[in-house]
From Swiss-Prot:
PROSITE patterns: GATASE_COBBQ (PS51274). One of its GO terms (biological process) is cobalamin biosynthetic process. The gene is cobQ. Gene3D superfamilies: 3.40.50.880, P-loop containing nucleotide triphosphate hydrolases. It holds the Pfam family GATase_3. Pathway: Cofactor biosynthesis; adenosylcobalamin biosynthesis. It comes from the Bacteria. InterPro entries: Class_I_gatase-like, CobQ/CobB/MinD/ParA_Nub-bd_dom, CobQ_GATase1, CobQ_N, CobQ_synth, GATase_3, P-loop_NTPase. HAMAP family: CobQ. This is Cobyric acid synthase. Keywords: Cobalamin biosynthesis, Glutamine amidotransferase. Belongs to the CobB/CobQ family. CobQ subfamily. Residues 251-446 form the GATase cobBQ-type domain. It comes from Clostridium botulinum (strain Alaska E43 / Type E3). The active site is at C332 (nucleophile), H438.
């Protein structure tokens, strides 16, 4: 068995594999190992663009950051992005195909060699590889063509750690049931079990752990407590994304429209941790209320989500609030929705070839097959209404979109990239704005000025200049916290022994 790798497989989706892989990567990095994550296939709308313009899943970006290395699409060679009844397939960072659900099995057969080649390239660069599976590892109906779980472990001869989530209940049955559905050779590959998301006192749980070990004849390597770590989520299945009422009266209230195909919600993680700012995800008029700012985020299917906004009456309510003075802000697909017209004559997004936008910005968007994926340095070139100190602020982020937006005479540039190209506009009064730039709020100076202007307008206490920590420093603190909790509760020495290090 190859002793340079290890693979975390799950009893189900969302058991915490991604977080545990990030934890082990940071633990090993702190011991001076050159370590990299790897996940053959990801299914997520929450993607990232690397320095070389490749698209990859956010989970492997987090794991790369935990490993203190530059993210590479080789770490996640296959990314599936479901949208409008079909799925966009990203291979090694570039659009490969759009497929129907019934085509998955045939696709996997084609991509198996590409996955192995990507793994080999990563393993040649790093001492240790920590792999992650996808969903549950014992889906017997998918087993023959699966390239992300046990077949991947066998392909690269990796020992396996099985991860189970106790918080959802039935943890013992899920572990035993999963192992029983594996073949004898597959079970032999499983060298340990981690029970994740435990609440309560461990001493009361220890007899159950011992009984489990007696049944499965595999050691439980630890019980990971249910603890909050402020790191980017893999997809939108998160407690953060839900309708909320506005909280304290002294908070700036920002309502983010929860779109059906919402993508890249990590754009707002920074806002979530600013004192005196209340972030709400809203999907009905009942919860919209009267916020200080409405943000329409990115989406994998702009036209369909725009139609849903109209059907739910949220579109009308957003327009009314804008007319009464609420700042409306759009990012990527949300930016396109704010315009006058969206044209999709090539059927890039689906079968709707034309849709009127909200009409708040004088832009028209035409979708095409070419997908823009690039990291961007940019600058704010216009202040907004009542937000007077953001002009000339530098921005760093990324673009990831289909479509080109043509700017009309009743809109003015809001953001330009380093080459002078307009990547965001506002109306002439500065009361509505949008941009293609993801990650805009990760630029601390811009966000400090943006939030303080809102606070000043409401006579709230302002943020100090250093109150909003540098994003990279904050993330690093969270990875260290995660690594410590992992080391305190999981038998890292045993994991290293399994890996042969």
């Amino acid at each position: 068995m190859n002793k340079k790798n290890i693979m975390f497989l799950g009893t189900a989706s969302s058991v915490g594999k991604s977080t545990l892989v990030a934890a082990l990567c940071r633990v090993l990095k702190n011991e001076d190992f050159k370590v990299s994550p790897f996940k053959a296939m990801n299914i997520s709308l929450n993607s990232y663009v690397t320095k070389d313009g490749a698209e990859m899943g956010r989970a492997q970006v987090v794991q790369a950051e935990a490993s203190k290395i530059e993210p590479s699409a080789l770490m996640n060679p296959i990314l599936l992005k479901p949208s409008g009844g079909h799925t966009q397939v990203i291979v090694n960072g570039k659009v490969y195909d759009n497929i129907e659900p019934y085509e998955y099995k045939e696709l996997n057969k084609k991509l198996k060699g590409i996955v192995k080649e990507s793994y080999d390239r990563i393993s040649n660069e790093y001492d240790l590889i920590v792999l992650e599976g996808s969903g549950g590892c014992a889906e017997i109906n998918l087993k023959d063509t699966d390239i992300a779980n046990m077949n991947m472990a066998e392909c690269v001869d990796a020992p396996v750690i099985l991860v189970a989530d106790i918080d959802r209940g039935g943890v013992f049955a899920s572990i035993v049931g999963t192992l029983n559905l594996l073949s004898e050779n597959e079970r032999k590959r499983v060298k340990g079990v981690i029970i994740n998301k435990f609440r309560g006192k461990k001493e009361y749980f220890e007899p159950g752990v011992k009984q489990l070990e007696d049944i499965i004849k595999i050691p439980v390597l630890g019980v990971m407590p249910y603890e909050y770590f402020d790191i980017d989520d893999e997809d939108s299945v998160t407690e953060k994304i839900s309708n909320k009422e506005s909280t304290e009266a002294k908070n700036i209230d920002i309502a983010i429209i929860r779109l059906s195909h919402m993508s890249n919600f990590t754009d707002f993680n920074v806002l979530n941790r600013i004192n005196g700012v209340n972030i709400r995800y809203v999907e009905s008029t009942k919860y919209l209320k009267n916020p200080d700012v409405i943000i329409i985020p990115g989406t994998k299917n702009t036209i369909e989500d725009l139609r849903i906004l109209k059907e739910s009456k949220l579109a009308n309510e957003i327009i009314k609030l804008h007319e009464s003075g609420t700042l409306v802000f759009g990012i990527c697909g949300g930016y396109q929705m704010l315009g006058k017209l969206l044209l999709d004559q090539q059927g890039v997004e689906g079968s709707t070839f034309q849709e009127e936008g909200l009409g708040l910005l004088d832009i028209k968007t035409r979708f095409n097959e070419r997908k823009v994926t690039k990291q961007v340095e940019a600058q704010v070139v216009s202040n907004l209404k009542h937000i007077n100190e953001i002009e000339n602020k530098s921005l760093v982020g990324y673009e990831i979109h289909n479509g080109i937006s043509k700017v009309g005479k009743n809109a003015k540039p809001f953001i330009k990239d380093s080459k002078g190209k307009i990547i965001g506009v506002c109306d002439m009064e500065g009361s509505v704005a949008g941009t293609y730039l993801h990650g805009i709020f990760d630029s601390e100076e811009f966000t400090n000025s943006f939030i303080n202007a809102l606070k000043k307008n409401n006579n709230f206490e302002l943020l100090e200049n250093d109150e909003l920590d540098k994003v990279s420093d904050y993330k690093n603190e969270q990875y260290e916290k995660l690594a410590k909790v992992f080391s305190d509760n999981i038998d890292v020495s045993k994991i290293k022994e399994i890996m042969g290090i």
